């Protein structure tokens, strides 16, 4: 194996031509060697390719010690192999040295003490084995039968069975030597063997009935029928009713069914072809008797050998014992289940007898001749009701009761009481342990209208509530009598000596029917034909099947109640959602001065759980009012696809609707939805007043307006090296600013109600907005940019705090800012920058920690995938929105006045990287690739103030006094806002201890801003309790930005010299 593998490795992978494989002297090899035809050449190539495919990998060879591992040198591997060989050699040498000599082996009786030659010893050993085999065969042939074992008290049976055996021994035929048998060597435990030979025995013999144990040794089967040798396809021939009524009852106590193998016998006579099976020329496979060998050329011949009297007597005794067991089981079944018989069986006597005669006569045997041979009767012992207390009974009485019920009598008194307790319970409740019922089936093979009664006795579980059914085939009536047995019911009927070769089809049908019947079909009257005083029936008793049905009905009712409760809860939740929707619409209508289209929420109970929390106005903004507009949101087909990929379970989404405040002069609005995924394994959002926080699983989206002479329209593209979603999303927008961000509802540990909803559609009918191409797929929220006129709440009051751990999934991508593509305006577009952060949790699992692509490559990827959706995960940008709303409200920032112009193409805007520390941001995103439109497009409005200089001055604490800043109208809470801004400036500029990243102080670089520059805010990745630094990148348009991977441990090296230090050093 090792050599072959080495040869396989040495084989070159390329295929040589056959001219190269053959010797160089053959100039025309294919003509001279005719065996190298094209077919053989192809087969050799296939063989070579198969060998190359099947050779073991290097890992397997390393595991098997054939090749050295990659991590260790080859010399070390060879040294290890040599050491192992030396150790094995030493071990073998030691064993050889320490082995005992021949005298020691003779003394230990391992070797025989003889001086004979080895060949002679082998001959003697063969002779000894042959002699032992002969002795064994003789003992097997003369082994005692079950009757002899019972007589010698070797087999434990009941007294009644012993009496029946002694009585029935007088009827044994004396001319058994003239009979010949053909026996299967596979014993009676294989019910698959078809009884392909019609065997007919003498009518005067009660023991020639061939029965067998089916797959369970307890479920024995008797068939009451009289067969007539006829080529008709009828399985059963009619049995006159007079025969059943004139037979003397033979009743005996049930014997314990033993698991011993009982050989299966068949008297063999002339074989008549009655079906296709018997006409099949194939010989029977299992025809060997014991160790008899039949050569293959003689297997098709019919070999009839006479058996000795010992073997015939053995088989006859087996038949007789099996019959007695079957009769005893039937009797015990009828005595224990007499209370389940219906009212037409009028007699209630305790003495129960039953016709259990088995008759298998040949063609000319009349019914009277069959019934004459069954005159042997044993007086039946009655099984009365058990007393209330079994403990007071003596052991002998307990054993007698057990014998009457066919149960084992061995064991202690407590064991006996435990065996009798089910009968005591059933007798007190009036319910029998098993019941014999009848079900009718149709046999398509029957052509006659006569009735033949077939009684199959099958086993049922003690204390089982499922009854044993009895079936009838066509007009042939079949009774199944349930017997008490600790084994499960195995309803496969045994083969009978009067079955034809087609009868096994019927037995299979019985087995299927018994396993497929429902308990409701079992409640039929029994068709047993008995004498008038043979059975006692107590009307009004409840059989076990009713108990089972009641239990099933109760379980079904409980399940229906649970379903009704769930439906009721779902309806309540849907009603609550409708009420909240109506309240939201009423608030919009009451506060709205400019008409907007309504918000459509399409509810589906399969995707999310919705909770909308209404919050009142902030205390510092109580005097101001704001009209509420609608933000354009759409989650289309591609969004649903990404939801199905990213969301494993139903996510509970909490939507907290805050009523924001604005000045009454402005018509626009900020709608804020707090979307929270109720997945608990992540850390909670812990926000502080005057702190700018974002969770690890959030994105911070910051819309900034920048005044520029040649303003450009920037849109965000997140380019990552993994899969893209090429489906374009066109989002309808309206004249409103909608900010969707991921946060935790304050002081809320679990949602009180959860309503399921699907991604909802907020239809607006003004503009069509097309998202920029992105390298990752996700759900998209797009927002139109309109003038932001007032801050909704104060900065400290608007921060959400929660102690609940939140886990954000890639639920929706949030995009702030103008992204419309198909509009024409007259003025240059506003420069809009998106600051996006994303945690590695949102990145695709295929993303690996490697150096990101260059900026130019990322732009090429973005251009090559123009139809893919931008994925921006749910943003926790409440704090940033509040910060810039405060700046706008205080007049230090100019609001975005109008919707910028659409663009038909996106072009990249390069950026510089610089770092500005802010001590309150705790998470870092992957970098975003920004694409800008051509600078020649017009916009409806130009901004009057550059946002970069504003933000730089604000962060440096040198905000201008408003000379170049158009202030908005301020209201009564301007003083609070200004004090809040001062506090924020102090926090941003004073805490230098929190500005260190990995124990390295950071320097704040003041970078001049140009007209075409863009602002990018990157947040460091850390835990919630570690306040790290905030990176502000102020790039020039002529430089390039290298994107960052979301899985890197940190973003930059900590010391940058200037703003042109673009090629970052990765840690």
Swiss-Prot record:
Keywords: Coiled coil, Nucleus, Repeat, Transcription, Transcription regulation
Main location: nucleus
A single GO BP: smooth muscle cell differentiation
A Gene Ontology term for the protein's cellular component: nucleus
Biased composition (Basic and acidic residues): 268-283
Purpose: Poor transcriptional factor which uses the canonical single or multiple CArG boxes DNA sequence. Acts as a cofactor of serum response factor (SRF) with the potential to modulate SRF target genes.
Protein name: Myocardin-related transcription factor B
Organism from which the protein derives: Xenopus laevis (African clawed frog)
Lineage per the UniProt record: Eukaryota, Metazoa, Chordata, Craniata, Vertebrata
């Amino acid at each position: 194996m090792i050599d072959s593998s080495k040869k396989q490795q040495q084989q070159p992978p390329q295929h040589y031509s056959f001219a190269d494989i053959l010797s160089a002297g053959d100039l025309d090899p294919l003509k001279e060697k005719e065996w190298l035809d094209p077919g053989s050449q192809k087969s050799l190539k296939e063989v070579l390719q198969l060998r190359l495919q099947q050779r073991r990998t290097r890992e397997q060879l390393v595991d098997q010690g054939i090749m050295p591992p990659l991590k260790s040198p080859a010399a070390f591997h060879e040294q290890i192999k040599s050491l192992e060989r030396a150790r094995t050699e030493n071990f073998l040498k030691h064993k050889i040295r320490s082995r005992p000599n021949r005298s020691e082996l003779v003394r230990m009786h391992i070797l025989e003490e003889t001086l004979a030659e080895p060949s002679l010893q082998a001959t003697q050993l063969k002779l000894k084995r042959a002699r032992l085999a002969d002795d064994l065969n003789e003992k097997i042939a003369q082994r005692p039968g079950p009757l002899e074992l019972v007589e010698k008290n070797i087999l434990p049976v009941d007294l009644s069975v012993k009496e029946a055996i002694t009585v029935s021994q007088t009827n044994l035929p004396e001319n058994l030597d003239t009979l010949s048998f053909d026996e299967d060597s596979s014993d009676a435990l294989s019910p698959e063997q078809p009884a392909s030979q019609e065997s007919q025995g003498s009518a005067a013999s009660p023991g020639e009935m061939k029965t067998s144990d089916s797959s369970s040794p307890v479920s024995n089967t008797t068939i009451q029928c009289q067969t007539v040798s006829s080529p008709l396809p009828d399985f059963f021939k009619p049995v006159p009713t007079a025969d059943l009524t004139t037979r003397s009852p033979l009743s005996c106590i049930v014997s314990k069914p033993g698991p011993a193998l009982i050989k299966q016998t068949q008297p063999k006579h002339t074989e008549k072809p009655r079906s296709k099976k018997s006409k099949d020329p194939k010989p029977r496979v299992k025809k060997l008797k014991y160790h008899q060998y039949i050569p293959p050329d003689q297997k098709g011949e019919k070999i009839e050998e006479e058996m000795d009297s010992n073997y015939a007597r053995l088989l006859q005794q087996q038949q007789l014992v099996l019959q007695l067991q079957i009769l005893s089981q039937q009797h015990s079944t009828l005595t224990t289940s007499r209370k389940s018989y219906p009212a037409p069986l009028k007699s209630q006597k305790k003495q129960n007898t039953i016709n259990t005669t088995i008759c298998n006569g040949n063609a000319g045997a009349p019914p009277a001749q069959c019934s004459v041979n069954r005159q042997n009767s044993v007086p039946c012992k009655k099984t009365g009701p058990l007393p209330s207390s079994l403990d007071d009974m003596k052991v002998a009485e307990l054993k007698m009761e057990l014998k009457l019920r066919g149960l084992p009598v061995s064991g202690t008194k407590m064991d006996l009481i435990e065996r009798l307790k089910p009968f005591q319970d059933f007798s007190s409740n009036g319910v029998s342990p098993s019941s014999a019922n009848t079900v009718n089936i149709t046999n398509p093979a029957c052509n006659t209208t006569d009735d033949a009664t077939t009684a199959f006795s099958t086993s049922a579980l003690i204390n089982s509530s499922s009854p044993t059914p009895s079936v009838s085939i066509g007009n042939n009536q079949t009774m199944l009598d349930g017997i008490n047995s600790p084994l499960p019911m195995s309803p496969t009927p045994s083969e009978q000596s009067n079955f034809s070769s087609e009868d096994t089809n019927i037995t299979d049908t019985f087995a299927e029917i018994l396993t497929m019947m429902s308990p409701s079909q079992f409640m039929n009257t029994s068709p047993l034909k008995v004498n008038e005083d043979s059975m006692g029936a107590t009307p009004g008793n409840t059989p076990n099947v009713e108990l089972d049905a009641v239990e099933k009905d109760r379980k079904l009712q409980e399940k229906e109640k649970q379903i009704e409760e769930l439906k009721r809860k779902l309806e309540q939740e849907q009603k609550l959602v409708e009420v909240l929707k109506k309240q939201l619409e009423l608030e919009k209508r009451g506060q709205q001065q400019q008409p907007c289209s309504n918000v459509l929420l399409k509810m589906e109970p399969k995707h999310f759980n919705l909770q909308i929390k209404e919050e009142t106005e902030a205390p510092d903004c109580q005097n101001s009012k704001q009209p509420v507009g609608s933000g354009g949101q759409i989650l289309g087909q591609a969004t649903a696809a990404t939801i199905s990929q990213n969301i494993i379970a139903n996510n509970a989404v909490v939507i907290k609707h805050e009523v924001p405040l604005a000045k009454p002069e402005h018509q626009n609005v900020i709608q804020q939805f707090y979307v929270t995924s109720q997945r608990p394994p992540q850390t909670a959002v812990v926000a502080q007043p005057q702190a700018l926080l974002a969770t690890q699983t959030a994105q911070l989206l910051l819309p900034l307006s920048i005044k520029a002479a040649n303003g450009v329209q920037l849109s965000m593209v997140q380019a990552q090296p993994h899969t893209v979603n090429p489906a374009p999303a066109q989002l309808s927008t309206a004249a409103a600013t909608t900010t969707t961000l991921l946060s935790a509802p304050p002081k809320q540990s679990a949602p009180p109600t959860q309503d399921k909803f699907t991604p909802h559609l907020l239809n607006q009918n003004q503009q069509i907005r097309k998202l920029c191409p992105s390298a990752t797929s996700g759900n998209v929220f797009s927002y139109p940019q309109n003038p932001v006129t007032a801050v909704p709440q104060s900065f400290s009051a608007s921060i959400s705090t929660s102690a609940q751990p939140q886990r954000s999934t890639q639920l929706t991508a949030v995009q702030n800012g103008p992204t419309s593509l198909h509009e024409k305006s007259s003025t240059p577009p506003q420069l809009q920058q998106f600051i996006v952060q994303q945690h590695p949790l949102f990145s695709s699992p295929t993303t690996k920690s490697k150096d990101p692509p260059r900026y130019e490559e990322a732009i090429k990827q973005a251009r090559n995938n123009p139809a893919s959706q931008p994925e921006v995960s749910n943003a926790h940008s409440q704090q940033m929105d509040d910060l810039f709303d405060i700046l706008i409200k205080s007049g230090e920032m100019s609001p975005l006045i109008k919707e910028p112009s659409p663009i038909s193409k996106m072009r990249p805007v390069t950026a510089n990287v610089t770092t500005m520390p802010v001590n309150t941001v705790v998470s870092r995103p992957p970098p975003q690739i920004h694409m800008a439109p051509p600078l020649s497009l017009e916009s409806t409005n130009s901004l009057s103030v550059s946002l970069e200089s504003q933000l730089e001055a604000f962060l440096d604490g040198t905000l201008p006094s408003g000379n170049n800043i158009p202030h908005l109208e301020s209201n009564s809470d301007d003083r609070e806002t200004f004090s809040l801004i001062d506090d924020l400036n102090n926090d941003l500029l004073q805490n230098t201890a929190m500005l260190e990243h990995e124990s390295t102080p950071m320097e704040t670089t003041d970078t001049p801003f140009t007209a075409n520059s863009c602002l990018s805010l990157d947040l460091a990745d850390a835990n919630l309790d570690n306040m790290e630094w905030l990176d502000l990148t102020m790039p020039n348009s002529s430089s390039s930005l290298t994107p960052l991977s979301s899985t890197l441990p940190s973003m930059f090296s900590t010391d940058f010299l200037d703003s042109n230090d673009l090629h970052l050093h990765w840690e």
